[in-house]
Amino acid sequence: MELKCFIEILRPINCLIAGLVGILGATVALGHLPPIKTSLLIFLVVFLECSWGNIINDYFDYEIDKINRPNRPLPRGALSKNIALVYGISLGGVAILIAYLINFEAFIFALGAYLLMYLYARKLKPQPFIGNLVVATLTGITPIYGAIAVGKIGLAGYLALCAFLVNVAREIFKDIEDIEGDKAQGAKTLPIVWGIESSSKIGVIFSVATIIASLLPVKAGIGLGYFPIIIVDGIILWAAYEVLKNPSPKTAGRVQKKLKIAIYLAVFSFLLGSITKGV
């Protein structure tokens, strides 16, 4: 057993980003950074819940990851499945306890997300399109969680909408990328059931919908600091063009990585836009 695998299995960079997005949701809702204590609690809940989600996903994806991602801790034998399960449950449990310290709504929200992550990994992930929607929903509600923690939604609703739409697209492209491994395990993902070309077109539709949704905060009065969203929309549009031109697992893999970069830049745009509102 490798000690570093306890960090690696969390996918800490992703969890770090998720935690920051939770704080961003609160910031966008308020128009300024929340108190340090509140920010820390939001970050910890989201980081630990994200960690739980990654671990339980790897737990149930053990056989598939032997093909698609053999270097991850579980398939390479660096960590046993049972230890990983206990580890994940513990982290998720701590997240729920911390959420209770914020407010009751935040507690219920965290508990619901915890259960949905388990249900997704256990049952919903192999279901065509349903699994994609669940992941996108969990991603989209991250900024909403921060907003709920401070008792105000505000512009965080637009951030959540954009996050949901772009992550539906990204999850579809990831399924296209992983189609061979998923086929080997008998999964029924969207590209397996509907084909790569049709799935690519659906991913493009959600990509374009993201661009349209990204314009809504402008009408709602977000600050001038939101201007980098133009770059984000350009990346998404180019990614959509690429996958339409050559719908294939290789292209989908490249495109989903570009969308991930776009997501990071969008987070930055919303942050700048929220703190410059009214300037």
Swiss-Prot record:
> Superkingdom, according to UniProt?
Archaea
Q: How does it sit in the membrane?
A: Multi-pass membrane protein
Which reaction(s) are listed as its catalytic activity? Answer: sn-3-O-(geranylgeranyl)glycerol 1-phosphate + (2E,6E,10E)-geranylgeranyl diphosphate = 2,3-bis-O-(geranylgeranyl)-sn-glycerol 1-phosphate + diphosphate
Question: Which GO cellular component terms are attached?
Answer: plasma membrane
What cofactor does this one take? Mg(2+)
Q: Tell me one GO molecular function of this protein.
A: magnesium ion binding
Regions that span the bilayer: 16-36, 40-60, 77-99, 104-121, 124-144, 146-166, 192-212, 220-240, 259-279
- Provide this UniProt record's keywords sorted from A to Z: Cell membrane, Lipid biosynthesis, Lipid metabolism, Magnesium, Membrane, Phospholipid biosynthesis, Phospholipid metabolism, Transferase, Transmembrane, Transmembrane helix
Q: Does the keyword Transcription regulation apply?
A: no
GO biological process: what's one of them? glycerophospholipid biosynthetic process
Q: What does this protein do?
A: Prenyltransferase that catalyzes the transfer of the geranylgeranyl moiety of geranylgeranyl diphosphate (GGPP) to the C2 hydroxyl of (S)-3-O-geranylgeranylglyceryl phosphate (GGGP). This reaction is the second ether-bond-formation step in the biosynthesis of archaeal membrane lipids.
Q: What protein family is recorded?
A: Belongs to the UbiA prenyltransferase family. DGGGP synthase subfamily.
Which protein are we looking at? Digeranylgeranylglyceryl phosphate synthase
Organism per entry: Thermococcus sibiricus (strain DSM 12597 / MM 739)
